[in-house]
Amino acid sequence: MDTPVIPALGGKGYNLVQLTRGGFRVPEGFIVKASAFDDSAASCSLIQKAEDCSGSIDDKCALINSVMDSTPVSDSLRSAIETVLNQLKMNPSLPSPLLAVRSSGVTEDLDEASFAGMNDTILNVPTDVDSVCDAVKACWRSLYGKRSILYRQENGFSPYNTSIAVVVQVMVPSECSGVLFTADAQTGSRGEISLDGVQGLGEALVSGQVNTDHWTVRKPYGSRPMRVTETRAGRQEYKLVSNYPKPGTTRVELSEEEANRLSFTPEQVMTVCKTACGIEEYYGKPMDIEFCFYQNTLYIVQARPITSLFNVPDELNPLKNRSHPVWSPWVCLSDCCLPMY
């Protein structure tokens, strides 16, 4: 994968742009480039103050939060966000009037270390500029949470001299959500897809709050079609749904019948698995994919290379040497664009 632009967009943002350009359905939105954080951090000498602090990591985290809380979003960034929000509001076909604001660290989703889940995601954010700016700042602050700092130290990255972009997307009110691996991370098999799903929003799945349904799907090969080889029900006791018009999510208890219902129909399983094979071919490597369905429409909300697989020799790897789209100076998620400031 072409990595030079990852420092501009963060791993998550870069992958979402690549997915969009590959023709995969990604929720509309825009990206606040990492340089916006860099400018804000420089304006208040944030990194220097963190490195000069002689206290514990907890002391450094408290200092960083205090400095960032007192540093407003710049007028130029606020104006750019307001402009693109107005573009979003003009689209009558959006699935939701709310936004998901997601951290996109510059060391996130790299081939050698994923950093997945280290930084914050803010859900159900209203589309006014004040709410979005507050959510962007919350993502910036999460870069310096204790867990994130320690993870960077343990993986050989600078704990304080780092950066972050922020992805702002339309919030899809997911009826069911899932995580899919296009290879078996335990056995290394490239011939199977591992799929886990839940009813409602995917945050219940990725945080491990509920039992998941599981499918193992054999990939097509030659004349052999794609086929489900294992289905295991997880019995989900509750689901998370949007708390609209208020921020946040609500826990909804499921009836006995609902709890025992599989999160995806057979048709949805085939749809997402076929799409996942296309994403894997597009990237040229096995992928970890997050997705959801709304009104039976599939949305890809994230994709990243699987970092824990052993290497396959090039001559045995049919995914080797795939081409990728040329980068342009615009950050585009569907029809909504924000210039790279």
Question: What do the PLM-derived regions correspond to, one by one?
Answer:
Residues 171:
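Conserved functional hotspots at enzyme active or ligand-binding sites that engage polyanionic ligands
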Residues 1-22, 28, 34-35, 134, ...:
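Conserved divalent-metal-coordinating catalytic cores
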Residues 1-167, 176, 259-267, 272-284, ...:
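N-terminal beta-alpha lobe that positions the nucleotide/phosphoryl donor
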